[in-house]
């Protein structure tokens, strides 16, 4: 790779991916690696300009605290410790970190003590930041100075002679109002990175590599209808055309008319081979009687792999398997040791039998979701395909709460289609990050005409988010919601009540299951 590089060592912060995206947004290539990555591995990056130590949930003074290879600190590169990362630097350089009497969580104001420090170029003397720490630095490390403080703690430190910095706050979070400036100061002025990461070069490089790797062989790819697999198909198809065969599995758990729409979209926009596999009966049979969300996810994942495997075996001439894996999948599926606990299982990364012996092609594995969308636009994919809201791998199987049946899915499909249609009619669809309907496992009493009803409840959900790591509910117009509710009640059989979910993430997740 010809680009200058920044590495992020991950100690399990919920903001690590956001931190990586901020670096990418600065047109600098970055990768996230486990906190215990060896010095030998790090030296494999020839144009490495700096390392960022992420935040994390642990405490540096605990016996089993997460550590880095101390040789990293002897490299002739810039280093920035964020939150836990700053405390780790403090400990390595013989300072002191203790549990704070006055802990800081949320918005805080820091005061810059060293206005001439390059980290704070074009930053005001007082600046709002986002704090999330129970521990604090009580004694400066040797050869370091304090360059910023808050009411409760040392907020930033800098080495006297080396380009090593620590910040106690999360500059990557938008609540840190000048965090972008601080990060860019570190990247451009301290680490001396070039703005040389761009997606046009990425596309050209991927097409070249795919051609050189595949040559005259065949490739198969599992299509979901989502953005990731669509863009993966587009970039591979641009490289090798009809040598790519896409397999689309109809699980029965897709949105209303999705199978028809997806097949039409691919046939219209791609010069590739597409095969449809109808497997809904299998999925409904395997899900019968299953209520627990994680069990449903695993069953759906296994069924998909079994169906895809059977279809793949029919393509005996295929040497390569392509996947729409993106960088968050890679980060979350890697063993970081320090990483946050698994919240929900991912079923779409790996899992195919070893005897298939495919070689893997993952052209998007180094891109974040927003970058994938940009690549899709650059490749000429239609806007409605690229800007489609995210859809979970298990599909409506996790939007029907508890047991999934064909009848329940049909109810949900109708209600969801009305909600999405209305969002488009009101020109709201592209103003929200994700919107959908969930079918609840409860019935309520209602009145329809002169008759008593006892039918299901559906919940509308619409959120806005930058990165899907945190999200807030959308403040949709009351008149809009009233119109949606009326149409669902009047047109969807077996539903007599509609609620609107206003829970943020956290404490909730975006999906109900």
UniProtKB/Swiss-Prot annotation:
The keyword Oxidoreductase does not apply. It catalyses: XMP + L-glutamine + ATP + H2O = GMP + L-glutamate + AMP + diphosphate + 2 H(+). Pfam families: GATase, GMP_synt_C, NAD_synthase. Residues 5-196 form the Glutamine amidotransferase type-1 domain. Its EC number is 6.3.5.2. GO terms for cellular component: cytosol. Keywords: ATP-binding, Glutamine amidotransferase, GMP biosynthesis, Ligase, Nucleotide-binding, Purine biosynthesis. Residues 197-388 form the GMPS ATP-PPase domain. Pathway: Purine metabolism; GMP biosynthesis; GMP from XMP (L-Gln route): step 1/1. The active site is at 83 (nucleophile), 170, 172. ATP binds at residues 224-230. One of its GO terms (molecular function) is ATP binding. It comes from the Bacteria. Catalyzes the synthesis of GMP from XMP. Homodimer. PANTHER family: GMP SYNTHASE [GLUTAMINE-HYDROLYZING], GMP SYNTHASE-RELATED. This is GMP synthase [glutamine-hydrolyzing]. It comes from Mesoplasma florum (strain ATCC 33453 / NBRC 100688 / NCTC 11704 / L1). The gene is guaA.
